Amino acid sequence: MVWAPLGPPRTDCLTLLHTPSKDSPKMSLEWLVAWSWSLDGLRDCIATGIQSVRDCDTTAVITVACLLVLFVWYCYHVGREQPRPYVSVNSLMQAADANGLQNGYVYCQSPECVRCTHNEGLNQKLYHNLQEYAKRYSWSGMGRIHKGIREQGRYLNSRPSIQKPEVFFLPDLPTTPYFSRDAQKHDVEVLERNFQTILCEFETLYKAFSNCSLPQGWKMNSTPSGEWFTFYLVNQGVCVPRNCRKCPRTYRLLGSLRTCIGNNVFGNACISVLSPGTVITEHYGPTNIRIRCHLGLKTPNGCELVVGGEPQCWAEGRCLLFDDSFLHAAFHEGSAEDGPRVVFMVDLWHPNVAAAERQALDFIFAPGR
């Protein structure tokens, strides 16, 4: 089909308007004929298009139409500036704010705690961080994270009470209270091979304890009974230089772990000490993207970890892996003569979080972001 102009050339129009002559009636007639020819061509084009659609197979037309509708729907949901309205982490914990309870149990009041701090507009902030990451890098592989942030309130509200991460839930991850050693075999073997190294550095640190004061670098955590101390090398993704200098070999060891979380707020590495008679009440961790690893350093009788209702005991020189987004608690019911229960705790990536997702989560949950 040959394209036809919808009107006479511009010069003819100008001549017709501004240069009256005896040929004006003839030019007007030519102009009308040209328009008539153009409309005939347009009508023929439309008729041809309609006939082409009629000649197509009805099933094929319906299929193409459905695919087009699905594509438009997908673009709408992916391209929205803001996620659907949902309950923020802050509002999930608002009811507990007045009396210091979390899921019916005491929680810490530390302003630095990513799990217990009430962060206004957290979900919107996470979505903004994800969009910023995608602009810099790619949306490829971000489906689960995008889904998790968009539907966070629904996920957290609909989770069974046995597993309810307080900050971020990544959907479609296999769930189990305890993991086998093979889940992160390399890192487990590295830690267990260096058991004596870590134990020696702990014993040097522990000599500074006295009945009258808490040694520098140690933190005392809130418990209903007993005493729970922690000595952080990495605290919520941030290295603690003063403490690392006191445990140089243990700190260097962290660098040899392949799956250690060290660049986002869900990553920690510390020595955890429970004195006899201590009870850590049931609580949930902040996320399901990590595995918490405990390497037993000193494990007297009467000590127990309960995750998702399943009890386990620590063993010296052995790693115990669990998902702390499950409801969990710890006890030291031994006597004063038994001494403290001591573990080296480090957070590892859940084995089913892909490499691209790990990079994005490090960006989204970077300390201070």
Swiss-Prot record:
InterPro entries in alphabetical order: Asp/Arg/Pro-Hydrxlase, Asp/Asn_beta-hydroxylase, IPNS-like_sf
Membrane topology: Single-pass type II membrane protein
GO CC terms in record: membrane
Domain of life assignment: Eukaryota
Gene3D superfamilies in the cross-refs: B-lactam Antibiotic, Isopenicillin N Synthase, Chain
Residue sites binding Fe cation per the record: 283, 328
Location of the protein in the cell: Membrane
EC number: 1.14.11.-
Residues with attached carbohydrate: 211
Keyword presence, Transmembrane: yes
Regions of this protein lying in the Cytoplasmic compartment: 1-58
Recorded GO MF terms: dioxygenase activity; metal ion binding
Cofactor(s) required, per the database record: Fe cation
Residues binding 2-oxoglutarate, per UniProt: 228, 272, 292-294, 341
Enzyme's top EC category: oxidoreductase
Membrane-spanning segments: 59-79
Similarity field: Belongs to the aspartyl/asparaginyl beta-hydroxylase family.
Protein task: May function as 2-oxoglutarate-dependent dioxygenase.
Entry protein name: Aspartate beta-hydroxylase domain-containing protein 2
Name of the gene this protein is made from: ASPHD2
